[in-house]
Structures are given as structure tokens and as C-alpha cells.
């Protein structure tokens, strides 16, 4: 599943977008959170036109967006992602085929018949490197271009129906994505 992402500046009509979101652009930097997505507006010089105007970046979880901001622990298929892309274009004018991605998270949820902590405790190394703790929910390996995370999804989202769900996730940075 695809989950978290962060974009570069988007070619949007920020006045219309801020109006649609109900956001007043009255300071240098404005952030607005909506159902797992965070719209970040920054007043800056547009390098294409040379004018001072608000530019917008988007980050967050497309998976949470589908669940109205509640969680990202259930199934999220490619068809769900395609529907989100259509909604983002229809509702906010965000064109997925020209949106610059700075990073993207993808992973898998695995329902286990036992606690995910058993798997987490058994995982020691990734390519000869030790994992670091991720609070009390899991472990991660940080490289320059990506992060590998293994954690207890039920513990993270604190929802009983996702008990014993192990999440294995990679957060890939732009330079990692370009290599592939």
C-alpha cells in the first residue's frame, strides 16, 4: 500500500484552493490539516513568474484521507489510491501526473496470530546494520535515501480491531525514487 507522501510546490491557484479549504492566507506561512492531509501555504517568489505569491505543498497520508483522518491501518489498494488521485484533482486541482514527490511511504500490514513484538524482537540487523528503536512500538533503520520501519500498527493507532497487526514500511526519499 502507498501511504505517506510529501510534494514539492504545486502549480495551483492558491487563492481558490485556500477559499475551498476555508483558510485565510493572512500570514507568511499557513498550514491547514484536513483528514490526514496537510496543506502548507508559504508566501514566496514564484521562480517561473518572478511575482510574490502563495505557493502550496501537500503532505500527509492518502490512506488516512480515505478514512476521513481516523487511521491508516486497514487495507488500501491500488484502486483506492487511484480514487484518491481523482478526488484530489477534482476537489483541489492537484494533478497527480505533474506533482513533484519529495518522498513516499509504502508498506504492508500483516495480521499475525501472535503479538508483532515477537517479530520486532527477533529482527536484529538490516544489511549488517542494527535497527534503532521507534519509541515503544517498533524498530527502524535509517539510510540517507530511505527508512525501513517495522512496528506494531495496533499499538501505534490504539485501535483494538488492529491488534496483532505488523506494519513493514519503507519511506523512500526523492533521490532513492529517482534511482529506481
Question: What are the roles of these predicted feature ranges?
Answer:
Residues 1-180:
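Structured, helix-rich domain cores that form ligand/interaction pockets
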Amino acid at each position: 500500500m502507498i501511504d505517506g507522501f510529501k510534494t514539492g510546490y504545486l502549480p495551483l491557484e492558491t487563492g481558490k484552493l485556500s477559499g475551498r479549504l476555508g483558510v485565510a492566507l493572512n500570514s507568511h506561512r499557513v498550514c491547514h490539516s484536513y483528514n490526514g492531509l496537510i496543506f502548507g501555504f508559504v508566501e514566496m517568489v514564484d521562480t517561473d513568474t518572478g511575482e510574490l505569491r502563495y505557493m502550496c505543498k501537500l503532505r500527509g497520508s492518502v490512506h488516512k484521507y480515505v478514512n476521513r483522518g481516523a487511521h491508516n491501518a486497514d487495507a488500501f489498494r491500488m484502486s483506492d489510491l487511484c480514487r484518491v488521485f481523482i478526488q484530489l484533482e477534482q476537489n483541489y486541482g492537484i494533478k497527480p501526473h505533474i506533482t513533484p514527490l519529495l518522498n513516499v511511504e509504502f508498506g504492508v500490514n500483516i495480521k499475525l496470530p501472535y503479538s508483532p513484538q515477537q517479530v520486532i524482537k527477533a529482527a536484529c540487523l538490516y544489511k549488517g546494520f542494527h535497527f534503532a528503536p521507534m519509541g515503544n512500538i517498533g524498530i527502524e533503520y535509517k539510510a540517507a535515501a530511505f527508512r525501513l520501519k517495522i512496528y506494531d500498527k495496533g499499538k501505534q493507532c490504539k485501535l483494538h480491531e488492529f491488534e496483532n497487526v505488523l506494519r513493514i514500511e519503507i519511506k523512500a526519499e526523492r533521490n532513492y525514487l529517482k534511482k529506481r
